[in-house]
């Protein structure tokens, strides 16, 4: 959004004021958009629909509380381009085949002018061919290089390996193998795990430092204080492929060596041999952590250069506007599997 604002866009961002996010809000007063917090849709419905009707583009997103209900009303507006942005498309589609979601119904997909997906690859074909999406395009995560860059080490974050992520059951097996087991076998190393919702009854290795929440403004310091950082992909996302986490690019922009599991399409974003460290077992992780600093830093620097060239907010803003223009014209070529 910041990059779009720099291009002259005026952005109104509506967010439901939920208790957890209220306690950990990233920005109380962002300078690149008008933040509109609301307690219930009914409270702001009239004003929001009036503002949406006067807009060029209206975007609704996955996980928006009551999003399907809101989209029903947004989609009735004649003026704006209707866009849906899905941050977890494979998960959304699996839910639609099962119990459904409260942020999107299957029949709504065909009504959006543009369906943007945080995941690329074959899921784009699936959206168009099986769900009737008019135009499905990938809009991957990105990084703001002004906010994410190498900083001085902070002692409270200093570690040999960090992992930043919310608890998810389908990541647990990999978390145990690639993070907790290396910690158990390396009493002389310090590990940092940051993120909410981990079970209270868990017993952590003594050398794992826990942070329930690290504000985005401190992410760069955490990455810069990590000798290496770990990326773990949710299984449904990994099965689909082409699913880079935004934190992937944030860590790379901070020159943090990245250890990661493999998923289809990873090599479309980074060179797995020259820019990343692929890990499948605890032994792989320990081998990386026992490597020399020069080897770790060389790959990290190559990943940083790749990120700044291809994965910034500026690049994504250009892509977003290009996809919107494509949707306006309604003349597009078939989606490529490697998109």
Label for each model-derived stretch:
Residues 10-12, 83, 137, 162, ...:
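A structural signal for isolated positions on well-ordered beta-strands in alpha/beta enzyme cores
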Residues 1-2, 6-7, 11-127, 131, ...:
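Extended catalytic core of nucleotide-activated donor transferases of GT-like folds
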Residues 71-83, 133-136, 177-181, 245-252:
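A short, gly/pro- and small-residue-rich
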Residues 80-81, 114, 135, 190, ...:
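Proline-centered loop/turn at the N-terminus of a beta-strand
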Residues 2, 144-228, 238:
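Conserved catalytic-core segment of nucleotide-activated headgroup transferases in glycan assembly
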Residues 53, 77, 110, 131-134, ...:
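Structured loop/turn residues at beta-strand edges in well-structured enzyme cores
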Residues 2-39, 86, 92, 134, ...:
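Catalytic binding pocket for nucleotide-activated donors in carbohydrate/polymer assembly enzymes
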Residues 139-142:
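Carbohydrate-associated surface elements
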């Amino acid at each position: 959004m910041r990059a779009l604002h720099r291009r002259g866009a005026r952005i109104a961002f509506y967010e439901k004021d939920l208790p957890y996010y209220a306690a950990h809000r990233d920005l109380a007063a962002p300078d690149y958009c008008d933040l509109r917090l609301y307690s219930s849709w009914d409270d702001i419905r009239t004003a929001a629909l009036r503002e949406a009707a006067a807009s060029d583009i209206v975007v609704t997103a996955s996980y928006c509380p009551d999003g399907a209900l809101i989209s029903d009303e947004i989609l009735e507006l004649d003026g704006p381009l209707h866009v849906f942005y899905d941050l977890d498309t494979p998960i959304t589609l699996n839910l639609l085949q099962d119990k459904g979601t409260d942020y999107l119904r299957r029949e709504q997909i065909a009504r959006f002018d543009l369906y943007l997906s945080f995941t690329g690859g074959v899921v784009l074909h699936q959206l168009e061919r099986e769900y009737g999406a008019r135009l499905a395009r990938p809009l991957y995560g990105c990084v703001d290089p002004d906010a994410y860059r190498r900083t001085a080490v902070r002692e409270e974050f200093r570690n040999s390996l960090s992992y930043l992520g919310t608890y998810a059951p389908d990541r647990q097996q990999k978390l145990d193998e690639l993070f907790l087991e290396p910690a158990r076998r390396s009493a002389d190393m310090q590990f940092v795990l940051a993120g909410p919702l981990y079970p209270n009854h868990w017993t952590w290795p003594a050398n794992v430092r826990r942070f329930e929440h690290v504000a985005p403004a401190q992410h760069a310091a955490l990455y810069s204080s990590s000798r290496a950082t770990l990326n773990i992909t949710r299984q449904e996302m990994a099965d689909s492929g082409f699913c880079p986490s935004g934190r992937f690019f944030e860590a790379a922009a901070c020159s943090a060596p990245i250890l990661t599991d493999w998923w289809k399409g990873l090599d479309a974003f980074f060179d797995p041999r020259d820019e990343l460290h692929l890990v499948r077992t605890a032994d792989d992780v320990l081998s990386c952590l026992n490597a020399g600093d020069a080897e770790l830093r060389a790959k990290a620097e190559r990943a940083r250069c790749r990120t700044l060239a291809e994965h910034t907010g500026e690049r994504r803003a250009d892509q977003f506007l290009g996809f919107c223009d494509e949707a306006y014209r309604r003349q597009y070529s078939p989606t490529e599997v490697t998109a």
